[in-house]
Amino acid sequence: MTITKTVTNFGTVSIVGVGLIGASLGLALKQADVVNQVLGVGRSKENLDQALKMGAIDGVVDLVEAAKHSDVIVLCVPVAQMRAAFETIEPYLEPKTMLTDAGSTKGDVILAAKEVLGKKACQFVPAHPIAGGAQHGAIAAKANLFEGKQTIICPLQENSPADTALIEDFWQSVGAVVKKISSVQHDAIYAAVSHLPHILSYALMASVINSEDAEQKLDHVGAGFKDFTRIAASSPEMWRDICLGNRTSILKELDQYLAIVQHMRKLIADNDGTGLEKLFKKASQARQDLDVI
């Protein structure tokens, strides 16, 4: 196919990894009419074919072609694959091409970008759209996935104000509410409010299916169990990489959580209804308050 470099709106956007996030981004960009073309890069023929079929991308290219001909490149691959993507992109990255990503961890991705891209790291503005779902793959994509949802941007010192503003505009164009924080803040916060909940959901599911009477238990699950374990249906590969990529912050949150669980276990063992109710009331009120934020 013929690729033409443009400057209209965001021009040619290449999305590397057209799963749920990548394909949804393609749909959203095209619906917003802020691009000339969206190109897909990926290893999954199934996702690429599905993205083409649904109109999320206009064509398929390899990463080298994307680096040579794109105005914006968005990395939507698992965080452990970011370094390899940077390594492929770096020799062909044009000075006017901007990079952003959708990774759920930032410290490790930024380190890889700086080590691989060197002086070109100024062209990378890290981002994390707080959107997704238990389903994964292009088949689950939807154009309104980012509408009204936060996208966190963690600018580098090397980024120019103009480049940061461009990537802010890029994510806002698909309906995202952009917030800027440091990568250190990002990884500490999301270890608690995103990464830990996924780990706990996987852990509960694993606990039940590994028990001797697993079949009987699963035959009796209700809405509460299904709600709690919904996110355990998320991509195992992605969450493996997130856990390892943000392990320092995650281990800190896990230790704090386990201390609470041990405290609750002691209250139950001691038949301490007053202590349990006090703990539950505090947590319950905090959860109710969350709904009015």
What role is predicted for each listed range?
Residues 214-283:
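Interdomain hinge/lid region at the active-site interface
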Residues 77-78, 103, 155:
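Glycine-rich, N-terminal phosphate-binding loop of Rossmann-like dinucleotide-binding domains
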